[in-house]
């Protein structure tokens, strides 16, 4: 009963917050873009405004989808989120093909299917939350009043995690503003590399969800030896998966780039960065982003947040600006700053993990 009440409070609060953020972005999109990216080409700014305005209308749907997806994962119902995510992506891809290649809508042709797919996914997964056979469901829980005690408990975990993610995304935007000054070839190469990089890290994304669930159970049972064992095992499996994909992407980078219709300069730059990323990701990504999930699962949320914000801003953002505006190194240096950020995170997280403070934190909580 308490879990069901908490589920609705999470959904209600997230939806309200997403609505407020949407209003801010819609009304202040122009100054926000100029603040983040400064002076960029007029065509790029126009396209950015179009994409931002359209996708901002999907923030509420995204909040509903993410909240419900998290609840299904908490019930070990990851198959539900997989199928809903698949539906969302199919709608998005088909919509992009129709709007871009059929209707020639440009940037709007990318943004509109994205927005529609998010609303479809939000509606579907929200309705699935009303199945009474589910351990956590929303049947009989609909109320428009906030439960203060529940919200406090939720925010205790949500605020550090949300602040970390917010600072991370803001840092990425600021880094993008540096990339935007390098011209359209660099912007295109950076975007394509980012897409391929996400493929490279897919095993890590999947295993990270498992780490949170498995370690939470171990910590709840007081079996910290098991928490450490499964952290090592899952991180090892993820690194093997990422390593295999890294080899494939390193060798096939010239072929993959041909699917994106890039110019010669952008294509060559993309191949170079994809290969550098493949090597770095195989060794650095999982310790930097998997180990902190063990700490969070044990209730140690402030330390990962502090390290992530410190490393992101001091190393990735500041170094990116130094490399770009002081040293004039180009796009590759932007990604090198990111890899340095990963190394710093890895050092701090592994040292914390090897100690016992996070275990004591779990016992107190």
Regions found by a protein language model. Give the residues of each.
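Short runs within selected transmembrane alpha-helices of multi-pass transporters and secretion channels
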Residues: 54-73, 81-92, 110-125, 204-208, ...
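Transmembrane helical elements of multi-pass membrane transporters/channels
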Residues: 54, 65, 88, 117-121, ...
